[in-house]
Amino acid sequence: MRVDLRPVTLDDISILRTWDSEPDRDEWAGTDGPWEWEAEIPIDEPWKTMWIAERGGLAIGFVQLLETSLDETNYWGEDAEKGTWAIDLWIGDPVHRGGGIGSQIMSRAIEILDECGASRVLVDPLIANRRAHAFYEACGFAPIGERSFGADRCLVFERRLDQ
């Protein structure tokens, strides 16, 4: 069954909070704590889009696309060059993980970024999240180095879209 992406709305806060409180959350999302969805969702900026992944009308995941050079938080620092975007991708309920849904979501996210003219895409899974490392490599990303983001130690991966 096909996975579709639709823009996040305030109506999604309940499911996002549920996913954000999963017992294994810190293993894949880091130690920064839950997102402030009420503040994040209404922000309408061309450099950041947030999507809900659905399969058969059921919300199963979340993806955020962020143009690093325009991100006001400067999260990506020196990696924030024009044309570089970052992806945050979650599969919410653990029952949906490991069945190819993430690959479908990533393919759709890459299509969107290609349409936006992105030349490079970054992801930042935690160092200990070996499952995510294998996933990103299978999706065409290559590791480019370790980096600390707040208290979290991550392995940054990139995928070039301009080659």
Role assignments for model-derived ranges:
Residues 92, 98-111, 134-138:
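Conserved acetyl-CoA-binding loop-helix of GNAT-fold acetyltransferases
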Residues 123-133, 149-153:
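Conserved beta-strand-loop-alpha-helix junction that forms the acyl-donor binding cleft
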Residues 31-96, 112, 160-163:
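Acetyl-CoA-dependent GNAT
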